[in-house]
Design a protein with these regions (language model features):
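Helical hinge/lid and interdomain linker segments adjacent to catalytic or ligand-binding clefts
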Residues: 85, 89-92, 115
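N-terminal beta-loop-helix "entrance" segment that forms/cooperates
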Residues: 73-86
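Short, glycine/charged-enriched secondary-structure capping and boundary segments
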Residues: 53-55, 84, 117-120, 153-156, ...
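Cysteine-nucleophile active-site neighborhood
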Residues: 100, 105-174
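Amide-donor transfer/coupling interface in amidating biosynthetic enzymes
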Residues: 1-74, 89-95, 99, 126, ...
Length: 305
């Protein structure tokens, strides 16, 4: 799919090397169709890496998309050049009058804090409310999934005895749903988190549908409002080396770091990772864009409500 991206975004050149079709604004304006408007609220510390990971997956349909990036005003990133943030990101307050066909809200390295103690909790709560009548479908990832479930539905999170770290087999519980069209009976999802939401809390709420889980990592995917909200507790967007980089980073800090499970070939960290989630990750984003955005969003974007 041709993605319409801001001129000079670093991800453009990175993805062109992977033979992924992206276009800048100059080329996109010559095509007489309405692109889908997608906004990414990127809360991850490594902004450029996350941008590239998500754009790689968004590129997997024939639809043109106009991708923009949102930031919270109440938090200043420490790991991304300020020039990059100024060039490619806008504060929520400057975007709140716009409407979008789709939105992705990423994870954040704050999961061990109480939600209300996060310094941008008030602002992100406002964004959660805003998305409900300004976006056709919103995808919440990892910490954002826990935060969205807590804010909208009162679902608590619980600390884990040890970090959920690795790639785990998932079961589709509602295979008839369009989000799983083309899926096998099982698929794999990377996880990297210290907290969880629990199955019994999801099942006790009639507004929520548990659509994928795992005996190892528990709740994986939850759907609400007929597909206008998806909550994914793992990281289908992760590149092949993300868990490896995280493992080596933590090993440099301390010795008592568990190796990511089901990740390295022969479970040997000296060998290359074995990617088992890429095909389903592409299919998941393709289905979300096609069935829950393109098929549902009004042509007149101002009619989203």
């Amino acid at each position: 799919m041709p993605l319409r991206l801001p001129d000079k975004l670093p991800a453009i050149e990175l993805l062109k090397r992977e033979n992924i079709f992206v276009m800048d604004n100059t080329r996109a304006t010559t095509q007489d169709i309405r692109p889908l408007k997608i906004v990414i609220l990127n809360l991850m510390p490594l902004k450029i890496t996350t941008e590239t990971d998500l754009i790689r997956l968004l590129s997997n349909t024939p639809l043109q998309m106009d991708v923009s990036f949102m930031k919270v005003k109440s938090h200043t990133p420490k790991n991304t050049p300020i020039e990059h943030m100024m060039m490619f990101y806008r504060d929520f307050e400057k975007m709140r009058d716009e409407k979008f066909d789709g939105m992705i809200i990423t994870g954040a390295p704050v999961e061990q804090m109480d939600f209300e103690d996060v310094n941008y909790w008030d602002e992100i709560s406002t964004i959660f409310d805003w998305a409900r009548n300004h976006v056709t479908s919103t995808l919440y990832i990892c910490w954002a999934a826990q935060a969205g479930l807590y804010y909208h539905y009162g679902i608590p999170k619980y600390p884990l005895e040890k970090k959920m770290f690795g790639v785990f087999r998932q079961h589709t519980l509602c295979p008839h749903l369009p989000i799983f069209r083309g899926f096998d009976d099982v698929f794999y999802m990377p996880h990297s988190r210290h907290t969880e939401v629990r199955k019994e809390d999801i099942l006790a709420n009639p507004e929520l549908t548990l659509i994928a889980d795992s005996p190892e990592n528990g709740v994986s995917m939850v759907m609400a409002r007929g597909g206008r909200e998806f909550f994914i507790t793992g990281h289908m967007e992760y590149a092949s080396n993300t868990l490896d980089n995280e493992y080596k980073r933590d090993k440099d800090i301390r010795d008592d770091v568990d190796m990511p499970v089901n990740y390295y070939r022969d479970n040997n960290p000296d060998k290359e990772p074995l990617v088992t989630w890429r095909a389903h990750a592409n299919l998941l984003y393709h289905n979300w864009i096609n069935y829950y955005i393109y098929q549902e969003t009004p042509y007149d974007i101002s009619q989203i409500k």
